[in-house]
UniProtKB/Swiss-Prot annotation:
It catalyses: N(6)-[(R)-S(8)-aminomethyldihydrolipoyl]-L-lysyl-[protein] + (6S)-5,6,7,8-tetrahydrofolate = N(6)-[(R)-dihydrolipoyl]-L-lysyl-[protein] + (6R)-5,10-methylene-5,6,7,8-tetrahydrofolate + NH4(+). The glycine cleavage system is composed of four proteins: P, T, L and H. PANTHER family: AMINOMETHYLTRANSFERASE, AMINOMETHYLTRANSFERASE, MITOCHONDRIAL. It comes from Synechococcus sp. (strain CC9902). HAMAP family: GcvT (MF_00259). This is Aminomethyltransferase. The glycine cleavage system catalyzes the degradation of glycine. GO terms for molecular function: aminomethyltransferase activity; transaminase activity. SUPFAM superfamilies: Aminomethyltransferase beta-barrel domain (SSF101790), Folate-binding domain (SSF103025). Its EC number is 2.1.2.10. Keywords: Aminotransferase, Transferase. It is an enzyme of class 2 (transferase). Belongs to the GcvT family.
Length: 365
């Protein structure tokens, strides 16, 4: 089992460690609901060092990487980033990722950074290398046993401003830059991104700097948060979890990610023909939000029923600490995906009433 450079700090700081995607990671510290509310109301921090980080360098790297993603990479420029997906030949989703444009590194070459999911990191890296290196790009794992730390919540950016002495009001959502943070030896790659539905930043640091910053943040009263709160936060924000809400058999239209597909651009990409056909016919199934009556929680793969008959499955479900009711994402036939449709979810042999509602369940006012 792999361990991040923050493992000991998490364990000795009260983290309950569990296996996740081949890593020992903290599932919670003080308690899921307390951690969840810290992020919604103030600020929390997460060790996300299990995720993969690749750097691609070469001539025209966006043109070359464009072969692998359906989103027009020329919509972002240096200092900007985009969320997108990797596809297979059938238009199914191999993984989701964020691509950061670092701009030119010399007269002839540019660079991109890719952050990929932990569970897919090895297969993604091999697959990307196999396609990008023959096309002239170098692909380097730059995490190098370093730290990825997510600082999330309405007080995250003010706290970073305090630690760096910089005004970050001009850093837009999905913008990124290097920051000098007091007490750290190296500059810190800082992106205004996250997986919680709150403002915040994700930071890439050396192992030593990551440990120092984690300790600094603890001293400032920042709540350490585990995978449990990360999941409830992202689910309230209706953010997808790869392997549950989408997979290699789900295309972006079926996953509610059709906005990532830019078929109007001339560039070819893996899965383009399949997505052109899918766009023409429309999806047979859709990912929807559900609110359930009562307090029973719908979990992954629980059957969704219509008039007592199975019609789909729950992809993710939880108790929402913010809304104080059960919520879920579910894959159901397009014909039943209209807002307000009454369905039910089979939970421990009982049909629990549920209603199709607008996503996300929570949005920062």
């Amino acid at each position: 089992m792999l361990r991040t450079p923050l493992y000991e700090l998490c364990r000795t700081g009260g983290g309950r460690m569990v296996p996740f995607a081949g890593w020992e990671m903290p599932v919670q510290f003080s308690g899921l609901i307390q951690e969840h509310k810290a992020v919604r109301n103030s600020v929390g921090m997460f060790d996300i060092s299990h995720m993969g980080v690749l750097r691609l360098e070469g001539a025209n790297p966006k043109d070359t990487l464009q072969q692998l993603v359906p989103s027009d990479l020329h919509r972002i420029g240096p200092g900007e980033a985009c969320y997108t997906v990797l596809l297979n030949d059938q238009g199914g989703i191999r993984d989701d990722l964020i691509i950061y444009d670092l701009g030119a590194i010399d007269e002839k070459r540019g660079a991109l950074v890719l952050v990929i999911n932990a569970a897919c990191a090895d297969s993604d890296t091999a697959w990307i290398r196999e396609r990008m290196e023959p096309a002239g790009l170098t692909v380097t794992d730059i995490k190098n046993n370093g730290v990825l730390l997510a600082l999330q919540g309405p007080q995250a950016i003010p706290l970073l401003e305090q630690l760096s002495g910089e005004d970050l009001s001009g850093l837009p959502r999905f913008g990124h830059r290097d920051l000098q943070i007091q007490g750290l030896s190296n500059s810190v790659f800082t992106a205004r991104t996250g997986y919680t539905g709150e403002d915040g930043a994700e930071l890439l640091l050396t192992a030593e700097d990551g440990q120092l910053l984690w300790s600094q943040l603890l001293e400032k009263g920042v709540a350490p948060c585990g995978l449990g709160a990360r999941d409830t936060l992202r689910l309230e924000a209706a953010m997808h979890l790869y392997g549950q809400d989408m997979n290699a058999d789900t295309n972006p239209f079926e996953a509610g990610l059709g906005w990532l597909v830019h078929l109007e651009m001339p560039a070819d990409f893996i899965g383009r023909q399949a997505l052109e056909r899918a766009a023409e016919t429309g999806p047979n199934k859709r990912l929807v939000g559900l609110k359930l009556e009562g307090r029973a929680i719908a979990r992954h793969d629980y059957p969704v029923l219509h008039n007592g008959e199975p019609v789909g499955v729950v992809t993710s479900g939880t108790w929402s600490p913010t809304l104080e009711e059960p919520i879920a994402l579910a894959s159901i036939p397009t014909a039943l995906a209209k807002l307000g449709t009454n369905l039910s979810v089979e939970i421990r042999g009982k049909a629990q009433p549920a209603t199709v509602v607008r996503r996300p369940f929570y949005k920062r006012p």
